[in-house]
């Protein structure tokens, strides 16, 4: 059975984490510049990420969340039935990532100070603003050898490596707390309680032709399925898998 996957954050902080994760993934995929338009995705993702860095103190929030995870896993030390070797390995990884995060510069500082990026950032988001007469510096850069452009991209991405490593680890461990269970949305609607949850993950069979509209917070949520073709609320029963991740 073919399914499509959905994730939904249950608090604003996790919503931002997922957005930054998506931007980092887009930058990574586009950094090969294998065709003539990948630079659009790369720079747009980079500048969107800088906007987020300027709006919130992402470093301090992520550091607090990693410390909370670390304390949770430390409480499992010497607990019978827990693989202590695996647990100690995980704690070592968490400690290393957290240490690198704390010693890193403020996210985006080097990128904001980069002369080339500063020169193109303001006009890049104008409608059609990447034309050569709007952004001559970008036009010149695009004609540099591919290996030079890829090297520049890697250097820019390396400035946020501590963020990337910490965010990937926090989201990985958070997702692993949830296990998919079969659920039924009666007449296309499902609601439930969730104790201090961060993320909902859904696997929905494509055959239903629906997508979810989700509302809620860390303690309670509701899912309404929408028919893709009509745009109306679905009234049939929908069997799907749900994981609640804390």
UniProtKB/Swiss-Prot annotation:
Family: Belongs to the ZapD family.
UniProt key word Cell cycle: yes
Localization per record: Cytoplasm
Species this chain originates from: Vibrio cholerae serotype O1 (strain ATCC 39315 / El Tor Inaba N16961)
Gene designation: zapD
Name under which the protein is recorded: Cell division protein ZapD
NCBIfam families referenced in this protein's UniProt entry, alphabetically: PRK05287.1-3 (NF003655)
Pfam assignment, any one: ZapD
Function noted in UniProt: Cell division factor that enhances FtsZ-ring assembly. Directly interacts with FtsZ and promotes bundling of FtsZ protofilaments, with a reduction in FtsZ GTPase activity.
Coiled coil (residue ranges): none
InterPro entries reported in the protein's UniProt record: ZapD, ZapD_C, ZapD_sf
Main location: cytoplasm
Record bears the keyword Transmembrane helix: no
Alphabetical keyword list: Cell cycle, Cell division, Cytoplasm, Septation
CC per GO annotation: cell division site; cytoplasm
GO biological process, one term: FtsZ-dependent cytokinesis
Subunit structure: Interacts with FtsZ.
């Amino acid at each position: 059975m073919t399914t499509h996957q959905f994730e939904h954050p249950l608090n604003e902080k996790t919503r931002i984490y997922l957005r930054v994760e998506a931007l980092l993934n887009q930058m990574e995929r586009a950094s090969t510049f294998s065709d003539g338009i990948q630079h659009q995705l790369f720079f747009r993702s980079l500048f969107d990420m800088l906007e987020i860095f300027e709006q919130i103190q992402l470093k301090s929030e992520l550091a607090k969340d990693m410390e909370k995870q670390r304390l949770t896993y430390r409480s499992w030390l010497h607990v019978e039935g827990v693989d202590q070797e695996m647990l100690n390995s995980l704690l070592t990884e968490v400690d290393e990532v957290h240490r690198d995060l704390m010693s890193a510069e403020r996210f985006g500082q080097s990128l904001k100070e980069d002369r080339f990026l500063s020169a193109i950032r303001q006009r890049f988001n104008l409608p059609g603003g990447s034309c050569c007469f709007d952004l001559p510096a970008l036009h010149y850069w695009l004609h540099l050898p591919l290996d030079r452009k890829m090297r520049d991209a890697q250097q820019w991405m390396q400035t946020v490596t501590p963020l990337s490593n910490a965010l990937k680890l926090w989201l990985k461990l958070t997702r692993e707390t949830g296990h998919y269970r079969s659920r039924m949305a009666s007449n296309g609607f499902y609601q439930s309680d969730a104790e201090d949850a961060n993320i909902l993950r859904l696997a929905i069979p494509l055959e239903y032709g629906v997508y979810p509209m989700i509302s809620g917070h860390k303690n309670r949520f509701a899912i309404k399925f929408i028919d893709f073709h009509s745009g109306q609320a679905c009234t049939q029963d929908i069997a799907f898998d749900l994981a609640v991740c804390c």
